[in-house]
UniProtKB/Swiss-Prot annotation:
It is a peripheral membrane protein. CDD domains: ATP-synt_F1_beta_C, ATP-synt_F1_beta_N, F1-ATPase_beta_CD. This is ATP synthase subunit beta. It is found in: Cell inner membrane. SUPFAM superfamilies: C-terminal domain of alpha and beta subunits of F1 ATP synthase, N-terminal domain of alpha and beta subunits of F1 ATP synthase, P-loop containing nucleoside triphosphate hydrolases. Keywords: ATP synthesis, ATP-binding, Cell inner membrane, Cell membrane, CF(1), Hydrogen ion transport, Ion transport, Membrane, Nucleotide-binding, Translocase, Transport. SMART domains: AAA. It comes from Methylibium petroleiphilum (strain ATCC BAA-1232 / LMG 22953 / PM1). It comes from the Bacteria. PANTHER family: ATP SYNTHASE, ATP SYNTHASE SUBUNIT BETA, MITOCHONDRIAL.
Length: 471
């Protein structure tokens, strides 16, 4: 082992982020070993062994200034990152180096970012619900504690805002710890998130040990190697907290950029692309990441992942591969956003395996199904209304349409994180209130109220108050 660690090689080829390094034949690094550039902070990760002592690596950083003949040493281990309490309140990059200008991360323990998923007998399924305070999510696609949730949506329909609101509602109320992995997203959003967390005291500037969140960023201006591995860095920190017996929230924004970075790396390594240009190992790469995001008998990881949907096509291989791993899917729709209804969650497309009378209870289950039936009927009648108008509908259909439009508006809600833009204070709605409100609308107890009374309110009582003002 000492022989491998001391191994020194030299660069023989450099094409963009791909660097080929030659080592003595008896000292070949293993796949995923981290190599260090001598005289530079750059780290290379071994991806392939080409034979004759040559390995192909991906640069985890800018490869500007590299040239043939430069010396490279093998660390003899995979990339290791600091874990534990010292990471709380800090912003780190893919290698676990701090990027918040607050000095080194003084962690007692470091862990490799590549590790096996927990064994089958260690897993612990949970049926406990995680209340989010967002009506449409709690009613239609409730989250399981220790489950995996995907926020699916095209460009500009509100994935990041929904993610921020979930962090705001869950991370503050949740006594456990959170890990946020910014994978290939805008630097501005990472900056906004940090300040948002500082303002809400989830990050305590005066005493970082009191903080509740660790942040790992690999933004969209970074090389593909960084974006591909940064999700694993965040996950490793989350796993270490879980293995201490804690309940952890793991946020990923955006899982699609992880796939995209894999596509770039795959192309750079010369692999033959598969459907739509994705890497041939897409399902395997996604599975390796997702299988590690799981709850064990010791602690739990509840994961919320934003998933960009290219060209609003849910059948694209990337979102389609992600679907298979999730317990709940929150689908954001451009059509609903265009009506001015936010959060723009599609109540007919979004699903959760928790919607089962044995898990959520009969009342919740029946209310959810009744709401979906009314909305489905409205969807079927929309074409008839567009051609013939409302007057041609049967009385019961007119009633269904009126209730559906009220439900649609009542599914909207002002967010805490959007107060600056909307001017109205954010609302947190408890699950009991959500069920009571929708039950009343479906039962016809709100038929006398105008539909605009339901727009951007919290509980059903607020809708009644708003109706009085309108009338």
């Amino acid at each position: 082992m000492a022989n491998t660690q001391a191994a020194v090689g030299k660069i023989v080829q450099c094409i963009g982020a791909v660097v080929d390094v030659e080592f003595p034949r008896d000292q070949m690094p293993r796949v995923y070993d981290a190599l260090k550039m001598e005289g530079s902070a750059l780290t290379l990760e071994v991806q392939q062994q080409l034979g004759d002592g040559v390995v192909r690596t991906i640069a985890l950083g800018s490869s500007d200034g590299l040239r043939r003949g430069l010396m490279v040493s093998n660390t003899g281990a995979a990339i290791t990152v600091p874990v534990g309490k010292a990471t709380l309140g800090r912003i780190m990059d893919v290698l676990g180096s701090p990027i918040d200008e607050r000095g080194p991360v003084s962690a007692e323990l470091s862990m490799p970012i590549h590790r096996k998923a927990p064994a089958y007998d260690e897993l612990s399924p949970s049926q406990e619900l995680l209340e989010t305070g967002i009506k449409v999510i709690d009613l239609i696609c409730p989250f399981a504690k220790g489950g995996k949730v995907g926020l699916f949506g095209g460009a500009g329909v509100g994935k990041t805002v929904n993610m921020m609101e979930l962090i705001n509602n869950i991370a503050k109320a949740h006594s456990g710890l959170s890990v946020f992995a910014g994978v290939g997203e805008r630097t501005r959003e990472g900056n906004d998130f940090y300040h948002e967390m500082s303002d809400s005291k989830v990050v305590v500037q005066e005493d970082l040990t009191q903080s509740k969140v660790a942040m790992v960023y690999g933004q969209m201006n970074e090389p593909p190697g960084n974006r591909l591995r940064v999700a694993l860095t965040g996950l490793t920190i989350a796993e270490s907290f879980r293995d201490e017996g804690r309940d952890v929230l793991f946020f990923v924004d955006n899982i699609y950029r992880y796939t995209l970075a894999g596509t770039e790396v795959s192309a750079l390594l010369g692999r033959m692309p598969s459907a739509v240009g994705y890497q041939p190992t897409l399902a395997e790469e996604m599975g390796r990441l997702q299988e590690r995001i799981t709850s064990t008998k010791v602690g739990s990881i509840t994961s919320i992942q934003a998933v960009y949907v290219p060209a609003d096509d849910l059948t694209d291989p990337s979102p389609a591969t992600t679907f298979a791993h999730l317990d709940a899917t929150v689908v954001l729709s451009r059509d609903i956003a265009s009506l001015g209804i936010y959060p723009a969650v599609d109540p007919l497309d979004s699903t959760s395996r928790q919607i089962d009378p044995n898990v959520v209870g009969e009342e919740h289950y029946n209310t959810t199904r009744a709401v979906q039936q009314v909305l489905q009927r409205y969807k079927e009648l929309r074409d008839i209304i567009a051609i013939l108008g409302m007057d041609e509908l049967a009385p019961e259909d007119k009633l269904a349409v009126a209730r559906a439009r009220k439900i649609q508006r009542f599914l909207s809600q002002p967010f805490h994180v959007a107060e600056v833009f909307t001017g109205s204070p954010g609302k947190y709605v408890p699950l009991k209130e959500t069920i009571r409100g929708f039950k009343m609308i479906v039962a016809g107890e709100c038929d006398s109220l105008p539909e605009q009374a339901f727009y951007m309110v919290g509980t059903i009582d607020e809708a009644f108050e708003k109706a009085k003002k309108i009338q």
